[in-house]
């Protein structure tokens, strides 16, 4: 290759990066590149032999390069990729691959640094995933090694053991998430040009082309038919809340109109004739009139009344008059109330039931037994102190019930003893007889004489069994 060809290749490699730095830029870069990194940029992982290895992550290295050189002040290019080995296991088809990558980093004035990176993988299932992993790993390694040649702030300080010893004692600052630093779709800086275009387009629009019309907005005069057609065409562009209000108001007005027609049919006919003549006059003079028409919601509108008989010289009153009379409460319908099921069955479809049969949800029924020590009108916890005196009093006044409880417990114990087995048959029999005698003794504990007789019978029975044994 001749000298001219080498210069041509060198110029192509440099690209547009052939602008010399100014004195201020050079001093800034020199001071920035000589400083060492803080603890927030240093990462650690376990290395061979159980030792800790300090390194800088690839995204932090790229962020530092953009901060020091500028986002358009440096570039990287892959110079070569060499596959060192690729072994395939014939038994399971696993791939072991290793390759080296050379990356060049060029800055604004044309200066560049190259370095080598390596990527490897063992026992990978496929060739594609093996090459993908190795090429990415080798390129990232080569990029970081090329950037560290520019100075300490781009990773060269990671090879200083004394620096790593001291920076390892420092605590990195806590990370505080700031949502204001996020790049959002509504970012003003990113949408500035689009907003300017939208403003120019909105300024050229006419009022009639607006999709939404606010209340009280003035429009040019139109004929009634055209206005109705436009409302039907633009009904889909109204907001949901506005449509809901329109439909509700129309239903109310229709109900009022029916009530008004039934109440005053003659007056409605007179008003309709005058309104028709006024609309015709407005249609004839709509092109010559300069007063704008206001679009509003479908509320009851005040209609002017003509004081003269002639239609052309009609004069309207200043006092507004509504089309319909105000609503009056219907006093004939009874108010809703609760009644019992028995009263409803006795009414047999009659709406009005007698007042005595009204349902009272707070009525205390005498058929339901309730404890006197508890207030059933409120939901409160029951205190133990209020219940214990009642239990003690009942236990003192009813000894028979206590005896019955004792007898029940004795019978349960005897049943358990009888089911033990053959070894304890004599003992279970003895226990059963003694238990019955004890129960008899307890049953007659209220009478002293009967208690003595029961005791004598018990002793005699025990003596007989002892002699037989």
UniProtKB/Swiss-Prot annotation:
Biased composition (Polar residues): 287-296, 431-452
GO biological process: DNA recombinase assembly; double-strand break repair via homologous recombination; double-strand break repair via single-strand annealing; gene conversion at mating-type locus; mating type switching; mitotic recombination; mitotic recombination-dependent replication fork processing; replication fork processing
Cellular-component GO terms for this entry: chromatin; nucleus; site of double-strand break
Principal location class: nucleus
Sorted UniProt keywords: DNA damage, DNA recombination, DNA repair, Nucleus, Phosphoprotein
Sequence segments annotated as region (Disordered): 265-296, 429-469
Alphabetized InterPro entries for the sequence: DNA_recomb/repair_Rad52, Rad52_fam, Rad52_Rad59_Rad22, Rad52_Rad59_Rad22_sf
Residues bearing PTM Phosphoserine: 296, 319
Pfam families registered for this protein in UniProt: Rad52_Rad22
Biased composition annotated in UniProt, kind: Basic and acidic residues: 453-469
A GO molecular-function descriptor: identical protein binding
Source organism superkingdom: Eukaryota
Entry's transmembrane regions: none
Entry's localization field: Nucleus
Function per UniProt: Active in the repair of DNA damage and in mating-type switching. Probably involved in the repair of DNA double-strands breaks. Has a role in promoting S phase completion.
Family per record: Belongs to the RAD52 family.
Subunit structure and binding partners: Interacts with rhp51.
Protein name per Swiss-Prot or TrEMBL: DNA repair and recombination protein rad22
Species of provenance: Schizosaccharomyces pombe (strain 972 / ATCC 24843) (Fission yeast)
């Amino acid at each position: 290759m001749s000298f001219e060809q080498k210069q041509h290749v060198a110029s192509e490699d440099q690209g547009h990066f052939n602008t010399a730095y100014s004195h201020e830029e050079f001093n800034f870069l020199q001071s920035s590149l000589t400083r060492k990194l803080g603890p927030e940029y240093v990462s650690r992982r376990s290395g061979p032999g159980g030792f800790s290895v300090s390194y800088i992550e690839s995204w932090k290295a790229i962020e530092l390069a953009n901060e020091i050189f500028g986002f358009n002040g440096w570039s990287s290019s892959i110079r070569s990729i060499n596959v060192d080995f690729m072994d395939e296991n014939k038994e399971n088809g696993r791939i072991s691959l290793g390759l080296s990558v050379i990356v060049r980093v060029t800055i604004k004035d044309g200066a560049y640094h190259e370095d080598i990176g390596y990527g490897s993988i063992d026992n990978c299932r496929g060739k594609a995933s093996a090459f993908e992993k190795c090429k990415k790993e080798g390129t990232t390694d080569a990029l970081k090694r090329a950037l560290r040649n520019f100075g300490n702030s781009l990773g060269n300080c990671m090879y200083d053991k004394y620096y790593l010893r001291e920076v390892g004692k420092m605590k990195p600052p806590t990370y505080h998430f700031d949502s204001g630093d996020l790049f959002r779709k509504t970012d003003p800086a990113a949408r500035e040009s689009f907003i300017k275009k939208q403003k120019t387009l909105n300024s050229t629009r006419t009022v009639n082309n607006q999709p939404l019309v606010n209340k009280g907005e003035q429009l040019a005069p139109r004929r009634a038919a055209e206005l109705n057609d436009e409302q039907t065409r633009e009904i889909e562009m109204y907001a949901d809340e506005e449509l809901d209000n329109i439909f509700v108001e129309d239903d109310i007005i229709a109900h009022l109109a029916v009530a008004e027609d039934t109440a005053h049919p003659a007056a409605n006919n007179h008003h309709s004739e005058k309104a028709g003549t006024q609309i015709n006059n407005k249609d004839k003079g709509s092109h010559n009139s300069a007063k704008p028409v206001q679009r509003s919601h479908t509320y009851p509108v005040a209609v002017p009344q003509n004081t003269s008989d002639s239609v052309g010289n009609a004069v309207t009153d200043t006092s507004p008059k509504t089309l319909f009379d105000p609503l009056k409460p219907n006093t004939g319908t009874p108010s809703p109330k609760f009644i019992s099921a028995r009263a409803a069955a006795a009414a047999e479809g009659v709406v009005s039931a007698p007042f005595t049969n009204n349902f009272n949800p707070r009525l205390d029924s005498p058929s339901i037994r309730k404890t006197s020590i508890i207030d059933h009108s409120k939901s409160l916890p029951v205190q133990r102190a209020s219940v214990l005196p009642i239990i003690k009093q009942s236990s003192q006044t009813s000894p028979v019930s206590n005896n019955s409880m004792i007898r029940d417990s004795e019978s349960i114990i005897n049943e358990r003893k009888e089911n033990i087995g053959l070894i304890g048959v004599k003992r279970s029999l003895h226990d059963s007889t003694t238990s019955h005698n004890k129960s008899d003794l307890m049953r007659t504990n209220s009478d002293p004489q009967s208690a003595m007789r029961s005791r004598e019978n018990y002793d005699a029975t025990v003596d007989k069994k002892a002699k037989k044994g």
